[in-house]
Regions:
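Residue(s) in the substrate-gating loop at a strand-loop-helix junction
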Residues: 147
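Conserved glycine-rich cofactor-binding loop
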Residues: 11, 18-19
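Short C-terminal tail/terminal secondary-structure segment
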Residues: 2-6, 21, 151-152, 229, ...
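Short, small/polar-rich loop/turn modules that mediate ligand/substrate recognition or access, typified
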Residues: 179, 184, 251-253
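Active-site helix of classical SDR
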Residues: 127, 163, 171
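Substrate-binding pocket helix/loop in short-chain dehydrogenase/reductase
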Residues: 103-104, 108-116, 142, 221
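Conserved glycine-rich Rossmann-like NAD(P)H-binding loop of the short-chain dehydrogenase/reductase
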Residues: 32-49
Length: 265
């Protein structure tokens, strides 16, 4: 009853999955026997090696689509390619995200627009493209990777906080619209996870706050989480697999915190 065998043979599209959280979730699907479409930035040779390694390790089909998450047409093509090449689409993970750290009065307008586009609007465009396919199939699972910053705020992250709050609101709306279609939509709200985006944040926070990187790590990054450690990608993957399995059918329109107690404070 509690095996994840129902994921075998399914198809997942995971945006922002060439590293970090996205890659961990894509790997979790593949390890359960599901086919995967990767997407994200990076060196093309490294991305191809990642794709080939994941396919070889798990024996499933793994594709890569280079969709730019600021371009609605490319996002729609990514979803359509998964359906066309792999025959179906069962799981959509909206994970792509970027960050910029700056006070509101100095926040560059182009950085604001890009963060809203990638962190929020891409979630809308991918979901819009996926819904008709999932409806036709009679089942679907949409998981949006929000953040603890979708529930609380921190200084110098206005665009990121606004986008992630928006993701949670969008998640609830989609869940209500599709509640009788056997399609669920949920959000996972991680705390700080040791990923490339967090590594860059440490440098940016040090600059903005006039602190050393070590002090940022101790007092700002891990200081937010009562456990005083990073959330692991395996911990996120465990929750994710539940949400996309048949056992997660009644989890809908919810946000799930995995933040070491950060948002309990």
């Amino acid at each position: 009853m509690f095996a994840m065998n129902d994921i075998k043979g399914q198809v997942a599209v995971v945006s922002g999955s060439t590293s970090g959280i996205g890659l961990a979730l894509a790997r979790a699907v593949a390890q359960c026997g599901g086919d995967v479409v990767l997407n994200g930035l990076g060196d093309p040779a490294v991305i191809e090696q990642t794709r080939a390694d994941l396919a070889a390790e798990t024996g499933v089909r793994v594709l890569y689509h280079p969709a730019d998450m600021t371009q609605p047409d490319q996002i729609a093509d990514m979803v359509a390619t998964a359906h066309r090449e792999l025959g179906r689409l069962d799981i959509l993970v909206n994970n792509a995200g970027i960050q910029h750290v700056e006070a509101v009065e100095n926040f560059p307008a182009d950085a604001w627009e890009k963060i809203i586009s990638i962190n929020l609007s891409s979630t809308f465009y991918a979901t819009k493209a996926a819904i008709p396919i999932m409806k036709a199939h009679g089942r679907g699972r949409i998981v949006n990777i929000a953040s603890a910053h979708g529930l609380v705020a921190s200084p110098f992250k206005s665009a990121y906080v606004a986008a992630k709050h928006g993701v949670i609101g969008f998640t609830k709306t989609v869940a209500l619209e599709l509640a009788q279609q056997n399609i669920t939509c949920n959000a996972i709200c991680p705390g700080f996870v040791e990923t490339p985006i967090v590594a860059k944040q440490i440098e940016d926070q040090a600059r903005t706050r006039g602190m050393t990187p070590d002090d940022v790590m101790k007092n700002i990054i891990l200081g937010s989480q009562p456990t005083k450690r990073f959330v692991t990608t395996d911990e996120l993957a465990g929750l994710f697999l539940y949400l996309v399995s048949d056992l997660g059918a009644s989890a809908n329109g919810s946000h799930f915190s995995v933040d070491g107690g950060w948002t309990a404070q």
